Each structure stands twice: as C-alpha cells, then as structure tokens.
Amino acid sequence: MSINVRKGKHYTEMNYDWLEKGWDISAVSFHKVMRVAWEKDCMNEWGSILALTYIAAQRTFPDYNDMSDNKAYLESIARTFGNYWGERKVRVNTVSQSPTMTTAGSGVKGFGGFLGYAEDMSPLGNATALECADYCVTLFSDLTKKVTMQNLFHDGGFSSSGVTQKVISKYDAEN
C-alpha cells in the first residue's frame, strides 16, 4: 500500500520519496523478479508469471492516489516483459481482483462504502480472495497456455458494468 495513502496525503500534495518507494515495491519489484528469472533462465516452457493489480490502474478512484499510477506501471511491465518472455514460451499476466478488504485496503478512506457499492455494481457479486486464488491457479495450467500479456478482470462483472438495477433501485428509493 502507498505510504501517501496510509499517511492521508492527497494526490495533489503527495510526498515524492514515498511515491518512489511505493513505485519500487508495487511495480518495479515485478520487473526485478522477472529479470532475475530471465537471466537465470529458470522458467519452464509454458510457465506462467502473474501479478495482482486493480482496476484503479485504468479508472479514477478517489483516495487510491499514487497506487493507481503504480498499478498502471505494473500492468505495463507485464505487457512489455511478457513480449520478451513469449520468445521463451512463458506467459505473463496481471489479474485485476474485486475490491477486497485487506490490511492495506482498510487504509483507504471510504473503502467500506466502496465495497458495498462494488457488490451492487457486480452482477455476480464481488469475488473473494479465495475465489481469486482459484482463478489464478487456472492461469498456471495448460488450459490457459495461450493467454499472455493480458490484464484479466476477476471482479464479478464490475469492470464491464455501467450501472446495475440494484444501484438504480437504491437511488430510486432515495427520491
């Protein structure tokens, strides 16, 4: 989690030292791990490398701040390094999970309310952390050996929903 978020720094006032640390931990570390694996040539053919990301890399989410930037860079690293790994028949993907209450997530202002909103906006409901883990296992199987350089949404349909009847009904009830 971003130190800027944890310390309550607004995006327009962020601390750049903290930004750099978050960038290194949340994105650059993925490149570093893949680089070591590349140099040691330690991935099997049709192996899979995976990172978790979040839809805020592609959409605006207030108070997620520089984590959005970090996740966008993480996804870019997966695509770019994935191109090179493809030469060795290794897949590289990111999975964008539903909002999930974690220690880090609990530090985001208004996250509890957002969880409820995301549940209402997801036709299948929010995916749990365990369901995400199950999905990730499939990305290590031969069933997905031609899937690479993708950001795959595992969010109950949240990423594709403009609005749901559940959300409309809540606003209708208020009026």
Where are the regions that the model predicts?
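Short, hinge-like loop/turn segments at secondary-structure boundaries
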Residues: 110-113, 170-171
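Generic structural signal for alpha-helix termini and adjacent loop/cap motifs
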Residues: 40, 141-145, 163
